[in-house]
């Protein structure tokens, strides 16, 4: 385990992951005929979803978790490439939809955009939080 990481449960991140999972499921089913919008946006959101799942259970800095989520996307893409190279076929239709079946550089771009979206979103979230202020003196100012 990377130094500074601890197991924990973050309910807000878990709720975000569940909500995003529902959105991804709707995108995969209802939006099945939306072509590249469904597939590209789905890949962008998939990295964000993996990040939220990691964040829900692992307390760590943003960058390592975001890189891990991006890495999961790259591993899926590598798996697709190797499956095509070795002419392997995933028999389960649902798993084939989730994992995809064709390696594509556009998918890697979508994963990179998802990674950047995670970093930007976390930066905006942290910027909106109140800063810890220095303790005030109990001595009255004259």
Question: Residue ranges of each PLM-predicted region?
Answer:
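Bulky hydrophobic segments
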Residues: 1-130, 140-142
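Compositionally biased, low-complexity intrinsically disordered regions
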Residues: 134-136
